[in-house]
Structures are given as structure tokens and as C-alpha cells.
């Protein structure tokens, strides 16, 4: 038996022993701190079953202290969230398959069926939850359990509303920043392009039932592009700004104060023509923009927020040991907590590997995503997404 198999068997054994303790003893005989410690060691789906035990234990499991403690324990096991999106044209929907990936194991989490989008959709993963946006319909999913909550329809005359999910650790609160979009035709460098400009800006705090949508006092239209990244309670995203919308800027939304502003311009040497090949991400605790190079390497612009004038530091890394044809199919999805770059394919295949590159040691490692079972998505072109820092959460149970 390998070391990883031994650890997995011991984990299953410990979980089974914890469950037997709860079954054999009356809860009145189990000290509260002992019961909570047992819950902490269980998989999230097992914890969910105990919600039906009593109102008292449901309140304990849904308490802020238990939720945050459960996630802290889960974060001690570094994993990725792998998503395969299967387009089902017959039923006019999408099936999202969630898996967690450790250094040695691929584990199936859940499946969620989403309505087929009439407009471009965006997904953002933050602190255990993932947001989906379809036109004006928004909902949040817990990949650990497959449970979702549908948000109220965005109140706007626009047809498309782009959203970014963020988490405020100080107030333990998730919020959606929603940009209501309108199209604008623009001539640029002799070409005509269609931009999606924000016309209204709203915020949706999760868990607020009465009048959840709130308008934000920010009236400057801008055209958001790329993904977003949430760092220490602040959301960042890139957008076209300025009167002629030719300037690329980094936008900032403080989740605590709910203030949206233009934070800084992108670096002067930033190759805007290849914008959609970039990933906005966290790099060693800082905001960064990263892309692959033609010569099997990575370039990353890191924002220095400590300087009097916010500046960007460019770093270049040459990767050895990866074949060019394989490197071309990879996309930078983020970094691990230790600073490794994560690269993954955009579509499922039977040899789906996630590549990790450590810029400090210039070393590579890879992990294969082993998908066992007769899933339909394995037999056709299926979109793939990989998110760093996957944690189990008991939210939305």
C-alpha cells in the first residue's frame, strides 16, 4: 500500500470511528466541545446529514464560529477545484461536474445543472463558493455539496449583468458586485469593436433577504474584461476606461465599505493586443497579471501597492522540461499558496494534467486528474476550469 493510500484509508477509518461515537452515544452524553471536534473531522456531506438531528445542532453547524473553523481546517489540505462543463443541447442546459484535486487524489464532489445561457456567463470561485451568471439570473453554488441558492433577478433595463464574487474576511460576508451592461460601438485603430459598458453598479450581499440589491455611488462607465481576483476583502478586475475607452485600468471594489474606484493604470509595456491571454490573480499576496510566452515561459506583472505611486514589477521565467505542443494547450489559472504557477488545459481529455511551476526553484511537477466512471462529458469536447485554493465549506447547507 502506498503512503497516500494508507493516509486515505486512515482518514476513512477515523471518520467512521467518529460517526460510530455519535451513533452509539446519546448527544446529551457527549460534551459540546467533543461533538464539535468530531463534526470538524467529518466530510461536509456527512456534516450536512446531522442538520436533521435537531434544531440545536443545526444552529451549531450553521454558526459563524463552526463555519469559519471548518474552513480553516479544510484549508490545511491544499487542493484545487476542477470543473468540467458539459453542454446538453437536448435539454437546453449545462451540467457542471465538480472535482477536488490533491497531489495524489481526484475526488468527485457534486454535479449541478444550470440553465443554458442566452448571454455570455461568468463564474468566479471564492472561499468555498462559486458564482454563476446567466443574463440577469445569478446563483451561488457550494461545490462540496452541489447545493445552490438562486439570487433575486437584477433590477435593470439592461439585458446583461456581469458579476464578480468577493469575500470579506473581517465581516465574514460574501458579496456580488454586479455591473449592468450596455453595448457601445467604437472605432479603434481603423477597426470597429463592440464594447460592453457598465451603466449601473449594484451590490448583492449573500444572506440578506429584504431588498438585497443596493445601488453603488459610481457613475463612470467602463468596460470590464478578464476575470476578477479577491484579496483580503478587496475585489480587483481589469477594464477599459477613459473618454475613448482606450486606457486599460485596474478597478478596485472594497467589500467592506462598498466603494468602487479606478485604482491604477496597467503598466505601459503591457501588451493590450493579447489581453485575453492573461490571467488576473494573486501572486505571493499581491495583485498580478500573468501570461505565457511563445518560448515556453511565463511573464508576470506584479503590483507594488506599498510604493507612493503604484508601480508594476515585471518578472520573466523560462520553463524547462515541457514540450511545446503541451505548453500551447495550457492556460495559467492562478498560483498555489506556496507561489507555484498553476497551468491547466481548457478542455477535458483522458490525459488531463495540471502542471505546477515553482519560479523560485525552477522546478516542475504535474498531477493527473483521474476521472473514474462513465460520465457523459468524457465522450465529447467539454470545457474545463481549474481554481486554486479549494476548501470545503458548510455554507448553503
From Swiss-Prot:
One of its GO terms (cellular component) is nucleus. GO terms for biological process: protein ubiquitination. It is found in: Nucleus. Its main location: nucleus. Pfam families: F-box (PF00646), FBA_3 (PF08268). Pathway: Protein modification; protein ubiquitination. Residues 24-70 form the F-box domain. Disulfide bonds: none annotated. InterPro entries: F-box-assoc_dom_typ3, F-box-assoc_interact_dom, F-box-like_dom_sf, F-box_dom. Keywords: Nucleus, Ubl conjugation pathway. The F-box is necessary for the interaction with ASK proteins. Part of a SCF (ASK-cullin-F-box) protein ligase complex. Interacts with ASK16. Component of SCF(ASK-cullin-F-box) E3 ubiquitin ligase complexes, which may mediate the ubiquitination and subsequent proteasomal degradation of target proteins. This is F-box protein At4g11590. It comes from Arabidopsis thaliana.
Amino acid at each position: 500500500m502506498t503512503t497516500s493510500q494508507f493516509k486515505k484509508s486512515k482518514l476513512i477509518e477515523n471518520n467512521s470511528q467518529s460517526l460510530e461515537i455519535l451513533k452509539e452515544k446519546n448527544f446529551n452524553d457527549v460534551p459540546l466541545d467533543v461533538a464539535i471536534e468530531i463534526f470538524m473531522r467529518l466530510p461536509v456531506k456527512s456534516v450536512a446529514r446531522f442538520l436533521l438531528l435537531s434544531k440545536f445542532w443545526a444552529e451549531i453547524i450553521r454558526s459563524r464560529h463552526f463555519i469559519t473553523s471548518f474552513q480553516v481546517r479544510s484549508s490545511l489540505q491544499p487542493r484545487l477545484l476542477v470543473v468540467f462543463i458539459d453542454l446538453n443541447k437536448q435539454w437546453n442546459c449545462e451540467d457542471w461536474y465538480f472535482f477536488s484535486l490533491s497531489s495524489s487524489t481526484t475526488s468527485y464532489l457534486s454535479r449541478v445543472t444550470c440553465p443554458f445561457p442566452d448571454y455570455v456567463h461568468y463564474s468566479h470561485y471564492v472561499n468555498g463558493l462559486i458564482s454563476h451568471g446567466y443574463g440577469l439570473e445569478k446563483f451561488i453554488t457550494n461545490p462540496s455539496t452541489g447545493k445552490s441558492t438562486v439570487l433575486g433577478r437584477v433590477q435593470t433595463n439592461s439585458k446583461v449583468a456581469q458579476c464578480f464574487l468577493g469575500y470579506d474576511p473581517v465581516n465574514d460576508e460574501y458579496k456580488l458586485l454586479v455591473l449592468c451592461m450596455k453595448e457601445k460601438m467604437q472605432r479603434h485603430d481603423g477597426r470597429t469593436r463592440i464594447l460592453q459598458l457598465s451603466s449601473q453598479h449594484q451590490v448583492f450581499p449573500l444572506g440578506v433577504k429584504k431588498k438585497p440589491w443596493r445601488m453603488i455611488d459610481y457613475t463612470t462607465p467602463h468596460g470590464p474584461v478578464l476575470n476578477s481576483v479577491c484579496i483580503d476583502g478587496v475585489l480587483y478586475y481589469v477594464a477599459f476606461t477613459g473618454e475613448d475607452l482606450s486606457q486599460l485600468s485596474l478597478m478596485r471594489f472594497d467589500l467592506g465599505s462598498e466603494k468602487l474606484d479606478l485604482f491604477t493604470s496597467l503598466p505601459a509595456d503591457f501588451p493590450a493586443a493579447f489581453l485575453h491571454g492573461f490571467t488576473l490573480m494573486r501572486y505571493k499576496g499581491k495583485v498580478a497579471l500573468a501570461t505565457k510566452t511563445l518560448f515556453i515561459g511565463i511573464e508576470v506583472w506584479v503590483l507594488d501597492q506599498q510604493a507612493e505611486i503604484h508601480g508594476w514589477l515585471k518578472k520573466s521565467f523560462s520553463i524547462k522540461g515541457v514540450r511545446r505542443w503541451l505548453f500551447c494547450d495550457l492556460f495559467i489559472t492562478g498560483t498555489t499558496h506556496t507561489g507555484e504557477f498553476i497551468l491547466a488545459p481548457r478542455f477535458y481529455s483522458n490525459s488531463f494534467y495540471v502542471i505546477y511551476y515553482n519560479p523560485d526553484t525552477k522546478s516542475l511537477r504535474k498531477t493527473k486528474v483521474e476521472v473514474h466512471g462513465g460520465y457523459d462529458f468524457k465522450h465529447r469536447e467539454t470545457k474545463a476550469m481549474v481554481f486554486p485554493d479549494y476548501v470545503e465549506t458548510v455554507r448553503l447547507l
